[in-house]
Amino acid sequence: MRTERATRKILIAGGGFGTAFIRYMAQLTGKPRPRLLYLPTASADRDASALNWFKACAPLNVEAHVQNMFIASTSQALGWDEVLLSMDGIVASGGNTLNQQAIWKAQGIDVLLRQAWDRGIVLGGASAGSLCWFDEGTTDSRPKVLSTVQCLGFIPGSHSPHYDAEPGRRPLYQKLIGSGEMKPGYACDNDAGIYFEETAVKRVVHTRPAAKCYYVSRVDGKVVERTLEPEAI
């Protein structure tokens, strides 16, 4: 007998995954009071990052959780799988994507996140928390200059967060795609985001009227930036 697989869902933002985005994620779970987990790995498990998460969740009918990576077996009784796979949604924090990826892979979190995605647990985040789901993208995770980073590869192609907020993002992203050094992909302004079902764009959203998303590709040797007009959430 054939078993129907759950729809895989990812909700990203270019920067700023606040109450409106969390509310939308909660709706995507289909649960009346969803369990939402925050992974502040990219922000080095800073207390301030977790505090902001709880503040953003406070107006919503959700059960908010945080899972740090800097833990010890003497203080954490539950395994990573018991925590992550018991959730309805998982949000990755902003911060250092390169370090985030290294820690997740060392701890086997990358494998569990794919299992969560396959089970229909909604994944998401902004900045490092949006970049992490793609094949690759632009990052400020290294000293001196913007560079590139390889990520989980759940969504094929590349990603640039903070497209309107950091002056170097747009020219570097277009240069890398134009030269063929980076795959075509999606760029998001701060306060704008994309909801993917499976790996296809289902809805483009924003919490600020001027914020937009883009699909950037190379056509006949030239870079083409196509605007994806969002709707307010």
Question: What do these predicted regions represent?
Answer:
Residues 92-170:
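Class I SAM-dependent methyltransferase SAM-binding "motif I" and its flanking Rossmann-like core
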Residues 51, 78, 110-111, 171:
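Residue-level marker for well-ordered alpha-helical positions
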Residues 12, 65-68, 91-92, 123-126, ...:
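General beta-strand structural signal in soluble alpha/beta enzymes
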Residues 1-33, 43-60, 137-139, 143-233:
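C-terminal and late-domain segments of enzyme folds
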Residues 37-38, 43-99, 103:
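Portal/gating segments that form or line small-molecule/metal binding sites
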